[in-house]
């Protein structure tokens, strides 16, 4: 059993690493985008949280295997809980977080949560993760390697084209990939 947080800037490879890890372990990935779990309807977010874990355990039972549970953008609902709750919305959000906390506490399997904002995650949630792995933005040399790997070799480039100059821009791998795709 492992509960892991991958954290770092957008486009640094957190989600890609989770899928690569699953592939190397010969496991499926059951992925959820946490920003889509929150609901404006009373009680719906709590149901959505329970459904994540129920779906995971059902899949384990049906396939007789254990997928990796991937929660993308976990900071969406693992943020600091409200103290001195006054509004009904705050109460519902805290209740949803408490359910999530309980589910993580009792989770059997491998769970990977990704976030761009580790500092926004409530300390009670943070403590329940065995590992916190930072994904840093690539340095100039790493960016150069990324550009060289991603730029199609058969493209007609201008004579003055210099791939080294591209690595001067502080971009993540995800951003470089987007630039290549949208050329």
Regions found by a protein language model. Give the residues of each.
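Walker A/P-loop NTP-binding motif of AAA+ ATPase domains
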Residues: 1-165
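The conserved phosphate-sensing helix
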Residues: 168-183
């Amino acid at each position: 059993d492992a509960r892991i947080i991958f954290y770092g800037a957008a486009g640094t490879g957190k989600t890609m690493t989770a899928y690569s890890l699953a592939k190397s372990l010969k496991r499926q990935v059951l992925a959820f985008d946490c920003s889509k779990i929150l609901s404006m309807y009373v009680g719906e977010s709590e149901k959505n949280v329970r459904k994540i874990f129920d779906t995971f355990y059902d899949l384990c039972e049906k396939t007789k295997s254990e997928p990796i549970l991937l929660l993308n953008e976990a900071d969406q609902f693992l943020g600091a809980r409200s103290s001195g709750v006054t509004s009904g919305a705050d109460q519902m959000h805290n209740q949803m977080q408490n359910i999530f906390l309980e589910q993580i506490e009792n989770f059997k399997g491998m769970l990977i949560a990704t976030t761009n904002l580790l500092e926004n995650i409530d300390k009670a949630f943070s403590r329940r993760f065995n590992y916190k792995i930072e994904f840093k933005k690539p340095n100039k040399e790493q960016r150069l390697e990324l550009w060289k790997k991603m730029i199609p070799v058969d493209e007609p480039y201008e004579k003055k084209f210099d791939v080294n100059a591209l690595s001067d821009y502080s971009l993540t791998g995800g951003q470089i990939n987007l630039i290549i795709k949208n050329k």
